[in-house]
């Protein structure tokens, strides 16, 4: 099956909730700390070099960027690139704006069907990552974590990062969280985990045509 994400193009940019497009197509949001490799991961997933742009100044991108996927005449879904978070030098007013924008979007956007959360595999589950999870889990929708830059880890370090992150996510389930919390290793450079991520994302967007033979991700 041709990957749906390979049919992606820029749609629109918004900076306020009131400007969110009145689309009916399902959305998948991509979130992560500044420098977690979010833009690079989106580009690799969509098989494009410059679809999502990384700011030259980390943490300064304050907009929500929409990318439509599927045939240009009749898009079937949207990918939503949320502002990176956690850069220490960002002014307080900007941080407050991001917090309002991100938390409100994640909690209230009815079209949103899941969250892809990027974490640097060398530093997973920071306090800000946990805040993102805690904003979203009340919706009951799934969160899938990509442990990015896993090519920088040894095999044993990768195993430990995956195991420890899954343990941290399991703690939310133990607290009664209903939505699925899954995790995998990912490297845009080595293309590690690319097919696995494709299959999961497309199963959210088009569950009726999801590949039934795909390997399950860690849960």
Curated annotation (Swiss-Prot):
GO terms (BP aspect): division septum assembly
GO cellular component: cytosol
Record-annotated membrane-spanning stretches: none
Cofactor: Mg(2+)
Lineage: Bacteria, Pseudomonadati, Pseudomonadota, Betaproteobacteria, Burkholderiales
This protein's record includes keyword Cell cycle: yes
Keywords, alphabetical: Cell cycle, Cell division, GTP-binding, Magnesium, Metal-binding, Nucleotide-binding, Septation
Gene field: engB
GO molecular function: GTP binding; metal ion binding
HAMAP family in the record: GTPase_EngB
Residue span(s) of domain EngB-type G: 24-207
Keyword flag Oxidoreductase: no
InterPro entries: G_ENGB_dom (IPR030393), GTP-bd (IPR006073), GTP-bd_ribosome_bio_YsxC (IPR019987), P-loop_NTPase (IPR027417)
Family statement drawn from the similarity comment of this UniProt entry: Belongs to the TRAFAC class TrmE-Era-EngA-EngB-Septin-like GTPase superfamily. EngB GTPase family.
Binding site for Mg(2+): 39, 61
Name of the molecule in the record: Probable GTP-binding protein EngB
